[in-house]
Amino acid sequence: LTAVCLSLGLLTGCNVGDTKNYKQAAQDLEQGNYEAALEEYETAISEGVKPAQSYRGAGVAKLKLGNYEEAITYFNDALKCDKVGKALKKDILSYRAVAYLKVKDYEAALEDCQTLAENYKMDADLYFLTGETALAMDSYEEASANFEQAYGEDATYDRAIQIYGAYLNRDMEADGTRYLEAALSGTAKNAEDHCDRG
């Protein structure tokens, strides 16, 4: 069996250690070691290991490090790869929309949000992202509708804080306060939500 694995590795040009960098990168990313994750993902990319996932991971690391333009480039490269599954594409588009928001390319962020809405089941995170994009574009009613949907899907204290923060960033604190009040007046959804409330 070992001989078969080694011969397959030699035939494909990959060695057994190829996925080591990718796996370490995923672990580093999860632990918040973004510089290390980026380095490992770049090694995985250069070795051709899981290209779409590796580009996506490098993009997330760049996003977390505040290098938004470079993150967008990695996300674009990920989307160009063969075999980008539907779930992975949704994830990449979501992250790319966030990166576009960070560089204030609101039209591009909106385009990704629209693609997500057309091709995927909307969830609380997608509603929030779409609401945040609409708010950045001064589409207050659309933002409010999306935030309502996000909070309806995920009526937790964390979600209320997230929506409040989006409004606060636009000097619209009063609009966000109602989510905090609703979260505090309701019952906790789980132990973590109860703990978040103090």
Question: What positions do the PLM features span?
Answer:
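Register position in tetratricopeptide repeats
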Residues: 30-31, 64, 98, 102-103, ...
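Residue-level recognition of tetratricopeptide repeat
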Residues: 26, 60, 98, 132, ...
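Short coil turns that delineate tetratricopeptide repeat
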Residues: 49, 83, 87, 120-122, ...
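Canonical tetratricopeptide repeat
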Residues: 57, 91-95, 129, 162-163, ...
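Start-of-helix register in tetratricopeptide repeats
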Residues: 19-20, 52-53, 87-91, 125, ...
